[in-house]
Amino acid sequence: MLRLSERNMKVLFAAALIVGSVVFLLLPGPSVANDKKKGPKVTVKVYFDFQIGDEPVGRVTFGLFGKTVPKTVDNFVALATGEKGFGYKNSKFHRVIKDFMIQGGDFTRGDGTGGKSIYGERFPDENFKLKHYGPGWVSMANAGKDTNGSQFFITTVKTSWLDGKHVVFGKVLEGMDVVRKVENTKTDSRDKPLKDVIIVDCGKIEVEKPFAIAKE
């Protein structure tokens, strides 16, 4: 009986080790778990220097997701650098709604009825892989399906109702305090700022190695 008991104990111990190994193999390692938490990769940055009225208020730096939405990012970068002979420099943010978003990019008319892309007047929605997860996400403004031009908006809250309707392509990495200053500027009954909100300078910042950011 003693030998049988010892044998049973050995079998049970071996079985426990096997089960433990299986559980260990099934559980995701730290790198896998972290990968699931990671969001899109920033491949390039763009900066805007803001002025409200005559007062400089600071710089906003955007991280753009060139692997997820390359065509949309290329458009935004080219308009920021002005490499095509037109773009965002000296244009205004024409629409500001507190607890929602701030909108700009109409460098032709300045009132939300103009603007154009580097591909022509309008270009199609690239994809809707990314969502409006929270404050600071940058997305294309449009007048309906496949009507992207140059206008864009920066969220100041989570705006889930826009998911699947507007192409998200970037996020504020630095300068969210500047976005808040713009968000809190006084506006008229049509959401136009009473003092001009101007992009006095803008450009591109290279990224040596793409990096992921959280979806928040």
Curated annotation (Swiss-Prot):
S-nitrosocysteine modifications at: 202
Pfam family, one: Pro_isomerase
Primary gene name: Ppib
Keyword Isomerase: yes
Signal sequence interval, chain numbering: 1-33
Enzyme class: isomerase
Transmembrane segments: none
GO CC terms of this entry: cytoplasm; endoplasmic reticulum chaperone complex; endoplasmic reticulum lumen; intracellular membrane-bounded organelle; melanosome; nucleoplasm; perinuclear region of cytoplasm; protein-containing complex
UniProt motif Prevents secretion from ER: location: 213-216
Modified residues (N6-acetyllysine): 165, 209
Compartments it resides in: Endoplasmic reticulum lumen; Melanosome
Family: Belongs to the cyclophilin-type PPIase family. PPIase B subfamily.
Name of this chain's protein: Peptidyl-prolyl cis-trans isomerase B
Catalytic activity: [protein]-peptidylproline (omega=180) = [protein]-peptidylproline (omega=0)
Subunit structure: Interacts with DYM. Interacts with CALR, CLGN and CANX. Part of a large chaperone multiprotein complex comprising DNAJB11, HSP90B1, HSPA5, HYOU, PDIA2, PDIA4, PDIA6, PPIB, SDF2L1, UGGT1 and very small amounts of ERP29, but not, or at very low levels, CALR nor CANX.
UniProt KW keywords: Acetylation, Endoplasmic reticulum, Isomerase, Rotamase, S-nitrosylation, Signal
Modified residues (N6-succinyllysine): 84, 209
An individual GO BP term: protein stabilization
UniProt activity-regulation remark: Inhibited by cyclosporin A (CsA).
Functional summary from the UniProt entry: PPIase that catalyzes the cis-trans isomerization of proline imidic peptide bonds in oligopeptides and may therefore assist protein folding.
EC numbers: 5.2.1.8
